[in-house]
Amino acid sequence: GIIMKNSTKGILKKHGWRIDRFLHHYVYFVFYQPYIRAALVCINFMDKISWCKPLIPMIDAMYQRFHAKILIPEDAKKIFELNEDLSAISDRNKRIIPFRYAYKILFHEPHHIAVMDCPCRKALPPYEEVNCCIAVGREISSFWLEHCEKYNARKITQTEAIGIIEAQRKTGHVTQAFFKVATGGATGVICSCRPENCISFKATAATRKFNKNLSQSASSGYSVNIDT
């Protein structure tokens, strides 16, 4: 018979009666690269039909359920240096993650970290295989380690995670924390991409042709002042 892996049982329990979310969660990570490539097809199509304004509410609804928060290096480092569980789930989070859904900040056993190949970097030019997509917390990292060998998933230390982020920043990449209703509505995935090879940045660029206020990414909350 079929033997369900422990990490699969974990996400099944997490979603309870919402089998639809369990299936979405499972497919999203187990078929990470095909999922991202399919998203890219949709983005390229939307880029050509920005005249179709009735799509704006649908795009906004999607972004309210799947979005990212840009992180400055110092904030990313704080996450990777956590030595105890962190739970911040109140509506006050919306001040820094300004979306209706998926704004919980939850890290259970944050020292348990995995990394795998970034699906965006493999789907977009120059089609690089870069091991820089990071999962923080036992639940999500265990799932990656049990299901994502084909994407070179491996366990890493907190120090190694900081090193990956720092190396990516030095080459002009932007770090984001991702939130998705279908994966529990909380952060856990942190990745670094350039705007030209990141699905979320490309989605924002395409959908801002519909409405300039549409964005899948929330800003870091910091601004730069230049003394003259």
Regions found by a protein language model. Give the residues of each.
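Glycine-rich, charged/polar anion/phosphate-binding loops
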Residues: F99-Y101, V174-K180, A205
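Ferredoxin-like iron-sulfur electron-transfer modules
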Residues: F178-G185, K209-T228
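Extended, non-transmembrane interaction/recognition domains
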Residues: C133-I140, A177
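Compact structured core domains
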Residues: E146-A182, G188-N197
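Cysteine-centered iron-sulfur cluster-binding motifs in ferredoxin-type domains/subunits
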Residues: I190-F201, S223-T228
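Activation/maturation switch segments at domain boundaries
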Residues: G172-V174, E196-S219
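Disulfide-bonded cysteines in secreted/extracellular proteins and peptides
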Residues: C118-C120, C132-C133, C191-C193, C198
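N-terminal, charged low-complexity regulatory/assembly segments
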Residues: I3-C132, I162-T171
